[in-house]
Amino acid sequence: ALNNYVALRYSSTHMSWLHCMWGVGASAGPYIMGLVLSGGAPWNTGYRYVGILQVILTAILLLSLPLWKNRQTGTDSEASRGHAPEDSGQTAPAKPLSIKQITAIPGAKEVMVTFFCYCALEQTAGLWAASYLMLHEGISSETAAFYASLFYIGITVGRGASGFLTMRFNDTRMIRLGLILILAGVLTILLPLGGNTSLAGLIIVGLGCAPVYPCVIHSTPERFGADRSQALIGVQMASAYVGTCLMPPVFGLMANHISISLFPFYLL
């Protein structure tokens, strides 16, 4: 729902920064817990601090509800400037679409597959990078874990930078740029030049992942229509979670029964 709200009412810049904040939060949580544990406090103290932050954020959201209601969609803004069709005021609210109706929309199946594959790549890279670096490249477990964390840092920093790049480039160009960087990063990992090269490849893959997710979501109302965007974004998220949950374990089976060296080929 939040993705659809932003896609309809804000620019691609805001969508990129919204998802950048996901990376900030995902990084801050373990950091807070690490500080708590290193200070000798019990683990539930860390959860208490995070819970306090959640309560504060919830209060801010509740207090800001009037601002959310007053924000116009792109269509509403055009109407207020006199650019809407004459019968736009009589347009009925969009009815909920069934899965069959959604998949019948031209391009819906393709975007579902896109989200499945993208999230499969992102989650597999994030979960298995450290194991690949340790078992295949011979890097120590501590260093491998640090290197793997740079993948998510690459996504977070990349989405922050993407917010500025979207001021100049449209969603389609940003998605293409991201895919090119992902391919370049995976090919870099494949180079037999040692752990530092694999590290560089992981960071490049992370930077490439940065614009894909937010820009595909933001382009949904434009590609499929504002009346269908909520339904399309819903199935996109479902496809994303299926890819996230299913494909990393599949690679785990391959790594266990064949070889962990298949990691970059699996990402391709």
Named regions from a protein language model:
Residues 1-21:
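Cytoplasmic helix-loop-helix junction between adjacent transmembrane helices
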Residues 25-38, 130, 162, 246-255:
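Small-residue (Gly/Pro/Ala) motifs that create kinks and tight helix-helix packing interfaces
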Residues 45-66, 262-268:
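Symmetry-related core transmembrane helices of the 12-TM Major Facilitator Superfamily/SLC fold
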Residues 72-111:
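Juxtamembrane intracellular "pre-TM" segments in multi-pass secondary transporters
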Residues 105-149, 153-157:
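Extracytoplasmic gate region of multi-pass secondary transporters
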Residues 158-171, 255-256:
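Helix-to-loop junctions at the C-terminal end of transmembrane segments
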Residues 169-216:
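C-terminal transmembrane helical hairpin of 12-TM major facilitator-type secondary transporters
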Residues 226-260:
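A late C-terminal transmembrane helix in Major Facilitator Superfamily
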